[in-house]
Amino acid sequence: MRIIEGNLVGTGLKIGIVVSRFNEFITGKLLSGAIDGLTRHGVSDSDITVAWVPGAFEIPLVAKKMAESKQFDAVITLGAVIRGATSHFDYVCSEAAKGVSHAALASGVPVIFGVLTTDTIEQAIERAGTKAGNKGWEAAVSAIEMANVLRTLA
C-alpha cells in the first residue's frame, strides 16, 4: 500500500497570500500568523508574496490569478467576514468560499481558505490569535502540507 502525505517542510516553497483590507484589525493578525507559520516551517521571507485586496469578495479573483501564474506552490487567502444585520454576510461568505475553491480546482495549485466567517467580532478576535489560536497560522501549515502532497503526486 502506498500512502501519500505532505510533510511540513517549507524550504524552497513559494507562497502567495491574498489578504483583505476590510476588517484589517483582524486580517492583519491573520497575516502575521500566516507569515510566522510559514517562516517557522522553513519558507524564506523572500519566497512570500502578499497581495492586499479591498474585501473578501475580491479575494478569489486575485487568488486565481496568483495560482494560474505558476509562480507559487500554494496560495493562502485571508479575510474576516463578520455577520451584520443583513443577508450581505451570507452572499459574501458563499461567493468567497466558492471562488477560492474554483481557483484551486481550475489552476491545480492549492488555494487555502483562511477567511474567517464569524457571527461576532469577539469570535473573529479569538480566531486571530487569542483563545482559538491563529487561523492564519493554520492556513500556512495547510498550504505547506498541500504543496508537498502535490509535489509527491507530480
Curated annotation (Swiss-Prot):
5-amino-6-(D-ribitylamino)uracil binds at residues 22, 56-58, 80-82, 113. CDD domains: Lumazine_synthase-I. Its EC number is 2.5.1.78. One of its GO terms (biological process) is riboflavin biosynthetic process. Keywords: Riboflavin biosynthesis, Transferase. It holds the Pfam family DMRL_synthase. The keyword Hydrolase does not apply. GO terms for cellular component: cytosol; riboflavin synthase complex. (2S)-2-hydroxy-3-oxobutyl phosphate binds at residues 85-86, 127. GO terms for molecular function: 6,7-dimethyl-8-ribityllumazine synthase activity. It catalyses: (2S)-2-hydroxy-3-oxobutyl phosphate + 5-amino-6-(D-ribitylamino)uracil = 6,7-dimethyl-8-(1-D-ribityl)lumazine + phosphate + 2 H2O + H(+). It is an enzyme of class 2 (transferase). The active site is at 88 (proton donor). Pathway: Cofactor biosynthesis; riboflavin biosynthesis; riboflavin from 2-hydroxy-3-oxobutyl phosphate and 5-amino-6-(D-ribitylamino)uracil: step 1/2. InterPro entries: LS, LS/RS, LS/RS_sf. Belongs to the DMRL synthase family. NCBIfam families: lumazine-synth (TIGR00114), PRK00061.1-4 (NF000812). Forms an icosahedral capsid composed of 60 subunits, arranged as a dodecamer of pentamers. Catalyzes the formation of 6,7-dimethyl-8-ribityllumazine by condensation of 5-amino-6-(D-ribitylamino)uracil with 3,4-dihydroxy-2-butanone 4-phosphate. This is the penultimate step in the biosynthesis of riboflavin. This is 6,7-dimethyl-8-ribityllumazine synthase. The lineage of its organism: Bacteria, Bacillati, Bacillota, Bacilli, Bacillales. The gene is ribH.
